[in-house]
């Protein structure tokens, strides 16, 4: 369809750690005691050996496409899961995206400790692999620019702006918490655009990748004009289908022709 690379669905820290505990002889009850919030998720998605399934996905993907295949790990702290990064590399992943999602709801937690944990997680992963590692950030930091610089100094080859927490909702008839909208809205693109512009103007020494709320070829053009090296799309493909990538590329090429650009580099901000 014309994509330049594929980022696979994230494998979650809880999936990896629970699989390791199974191998070490822990019971299901022990695992759920350790990860109570993940019980429903694990019951639904743990079919066979989750790590092996993910590695198989990498290998099979490499066989059918000639573009980079990027593995993704969703994590919130350092743990046993880190050693699995090497296995994903060995399975053929061309790069790794760390989708770090630390929920800061503890009022006693020093905000600086959160940023230090991001750096620490990245460094531990970097020790185990030699493929490029990018970090996917949230937008709720006091100083995103400083964190971005510190992550690049710690070895990040790319920064992805931004990740997205699953949003809760409440069913007022059943008076229960339910899952909210799981895909991004086009309006979310504007915040990404702001921060891509700000960080690119500061010459962050790594690639900047725009994510969240990118729905059209026009959205992609805006992000590149702002300074993004790459642009990620997901929600629009759920809504419009994988083949929509062709339309987005066609729209970008038509715009480039109108403005006499021969290469994407010619109009990157």
PLM features: residue spans?
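Alpha/beta enzyme core
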Residues: 1-33, 49-70, 74-209, 215-233
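Extended, intrinsically disordered, low-complexity segments
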Residues: 28-39, 189, 197-198, 250-269
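Short glycine/proline- and acidic residue-enriched helix-loop micro-motifs
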Residues: 36-45, 182
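A structural signal for short, well-ordered beta-strand elements
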Residues: 47, 213, 257-260
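Short glycine-rich loop/turn motifs that provide flexible caps or phosphate-binding loops at active sites
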Residues: 211-212, 268
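Shared catalytic-loop signature of beta/alpha-barrel
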Residues: 221, 226-262, 266
């Amino acid at each position: 369809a014309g994509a330049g690379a594929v980022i696979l669905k994230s494998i979650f820290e809880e999936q990896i750690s629970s699989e390791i505990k199974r191998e070490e002889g822990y019971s299901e009850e022990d695992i759920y005691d350790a990860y109570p919030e993940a019980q429903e998720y694990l019951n639904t998605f743990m079919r066979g050996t989750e790590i092996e399934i993910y590695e198989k996905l990498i290998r099979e993907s490499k066989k059918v496409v000639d573009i980079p295949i990027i593995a993704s790990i969703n994590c919130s702290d350092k743990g046993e899961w880190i050693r699995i990064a090497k296995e994903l590399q060995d399975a053929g992943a061309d790069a790794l995206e760390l989708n770090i999602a630390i929920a800061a709801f503890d009022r006693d937690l020093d905000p600086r400790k959160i940023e230090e944990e991001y750096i620490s997680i990245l460094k531990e992963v970097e020790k185990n692999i030699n493929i490029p590692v990018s970090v996917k950030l949230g937008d709720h930091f006091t100083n995103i620019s400083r964190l971005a610089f510190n992550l690049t100094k710690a070895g990040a080859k790319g920064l992805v702006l931004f990740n997205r927490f699953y949003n809760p909702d409440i069913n007022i008839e059943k008076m229960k918490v339910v899952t909210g909208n799981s895909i991004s809205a086009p309006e979310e693109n504007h915040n990404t655009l702001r921060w891509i512009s700000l960080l690119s103007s500061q010459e962050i020494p790594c690639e900047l990748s725009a994510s969240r709320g990118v729905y059209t070829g026009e959205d992609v053009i805006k992000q590149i004009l702002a300074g993004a090296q790459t642009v990620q799309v997901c929600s629009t493909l759920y809504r419009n289908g994988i083949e929509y990538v062709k339309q987005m590329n066609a729209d970008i090429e038509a715009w480039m022709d109108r403005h006499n650009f021969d290469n994407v580099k010619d109009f990157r901000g």
